[in-house]
Amino acid sequence: MKCGFDIATFTCHAVYMNYWKRAIPLFFVVVGCSSFQKSPVHVLEVGIDVRRDVAVIDPENGNDSGWEWMLERISGADIVLLGELHDHAVGHAIQLALVEDVLDQFPKSAVAFEMLERDEQHRVDDYMDGVIDAIKLSSLTQSTNWGARGGWAAWYQPIIDAVKDRGGVVVAANAPRRYVKLARTGGFDRIDSLPKERRSLVDYPAELSGGRYRERFWEFAAHHEDSGEEEIDVTTIDPDDPLLPMYRSQQTWDATMAQSIINTKPSTERKVLLLVGQFHVEYDGGIVQELRKRMPRASVLVISIQREFPEEDWQGTPPSADVMVVETLN
């Protein structure tokens, strides 16, 4: 069963679990997939009009600039990264509304999913072509409980259906978990030793991402050891640092999703939207850095979708995102 990762939570990725039990037991709050109790709220039943009732914040000035302003920002972009909290029902409703609006205006656009892995693309294509139904798709991709028990049908399948109804493209963007694990345990050289066909399913960075993204990764990892007040210097990484293998895994996800976007040939008229956990894209995240290296002329817009204003400095340098959508101002 596949589950998700966001800024505060590692969940059931098999890549992570044994390592954390041995090396850093309290790295993040661990939420096992079995801990989800209630059925998730469906994106069509969140009880608000997300186009009207959420705040669309411009981090440059902190103003609520509105839904239409966000669509104008999107219209000038080639690539739109929708950073989510995986268990945020209203956030997924916002994603659905954005996908609908963007594909209505730019019908040749594509929507890529962190939740689907490259070797599952043929199953996605079978669904889009009517060969299999939605239940079969979630079963074959082991996605039924993505984000929460029953999360796929409530949150992600409606977005896929919106793309299908508009004649768009769905992209399985992520690296297969077995190769993410291989990057962690064997290093990137081990990835290069794969036969050509399997090697095409995964990418890794030429150089590990730095800046605030790297700092945040180490800060969250070290938080269980102290108050978090001590500044962490990760300008260089000790080869023996126990977090380095985990960062290789993280960066394998980043690089693979970035290259999946590029392979889809994004442009202003044929946009690629990526649904992905916030951590990968916020504060000049790993995917953003990889896109800049691999496709430097692309116009990339990062939209961070929040339940409430984050405590972290979202207007700093770099800011959390180009646009921040907030469910509640309380």
What do these predicted ranges mean?
Residues G62-N63, W67-D104:
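Zymogen propeptides
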Residues H86-D101, K108-A112, R118-M128:
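Membrane-embedded segments
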Residues Y19-L26:
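Sec-dependent signal peptide recognition
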Residues F27-S35:
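Hydrophobic h-region of N-terminal signal peptides that target proteins for export
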Residues S39-V46, T256-S267, L273, Q278-N330:
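C-terminal regions of proteins
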Residues S34-A77:
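N- or domain-start disorder-to-order transition segments that initiate the globular core
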Residues A110, H122-S260:
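A substrate-binding/cap region within the structured catalytic cores of diverse enzymes
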